[in-house]
A protein has these predicted regions:
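Residue-level signal for inorganic ion chemistry
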Residues: 11, 29, 83, 87, ...
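Histidine-rich, glycine-flanked metal-binding segment
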Residues: 1-56
């Protein structure tokens, strides 16, 4: 075990589903060990946070960092600092809302370049599935995107159009061959065409929502 250069002590440390008093040993910025609450080595700087909870960093897989192109909405600097302040140590950025979107290798590289030197935490990227980019899926996968996102209704931004069922099926086959994850904004407008309109007095009933 590496000797720690910092020890953080708490009465509530979360590890493998158990909450217990412990000391967290940190060496060169990396957690090196957990020991009993009273086992803080002498001469090592320590911080006692009382009963504040120490837990592994959270991962948020649905984040919209709109840089480049719409940084006034959110950029890597603000998004990752806010995440760190809330205990989130990894985010995965959605492929739309930036300009260009992450629907090909060029868009991904522009994202990576925009993130350079601005991230306070770890950042991963989703790729986008849009009409006409099926040949971009494999290169994006090989470049390291963690999966793909598509919309089945308009996304709200013109540069990230939705796919039809006819476009979705061959893309799903391609992604299956890659072992890649596909996320779908899962509304199918045509499936709702014959749904009877609810009576106004019923629309807020929870039982109706469940149906």
């Amino acid at each position: 075990m590496l000797p720690p250069d910092l020890v953080i002590r708490s009465t509530r440390v979360v590890c493998r589903g158990v909450v217990a008093p412990a000391c967290v040993h940190v060496s060169n910025g990396v957690i090196a060990a957990l020991t009993a609450h009273h086992e803080a080595p002498a001469g090592v700087p320590s911080v006692d946070v009382g009963n504040a909870v120490i837990l592994p960093g959270l991962v948020d897989t649905h984040v919209h960092v709109n840089e480049p192109g719409r940084t006034e909405w959110e950029g890597f600097q603000t998004a990752t600092r806010a995440a760190a302040a809330g205990g989130v140590t990894t985010i995965v950025d959605m492929p739309l809302n930036s300009i260009p979107p992450v629907t090909d290798g060029k868009g991904l590289q522009m994202k990576i370049d925009a993130a350079g030197g601005q991230c306070w935490i770890d950042v991963g990227f989703w790729g986008g599935l849009v009409p006409g980019n099926i040949l971009e899926l494999r290169p994006l996968h090989e470049q390291g995107v963690l999966g793909f996102k598509c919309f089945l209704i308009p996304s709200g931004v013109d540069e990230f159009p939705c796919v039809t069922e006819a476009e979705l099926r061959p893309a799903m086959a391609e992604l299956s061959s890659l072992g890649a994850v596909l996320l779908a904004h899962a509304e199918l407008p045509q499936a709702n065409k014959n749904v009877p309109k609810l009576q106004p007095s019923m629309e807020r009933q929870y039982s109706v929502y469940l149906q």
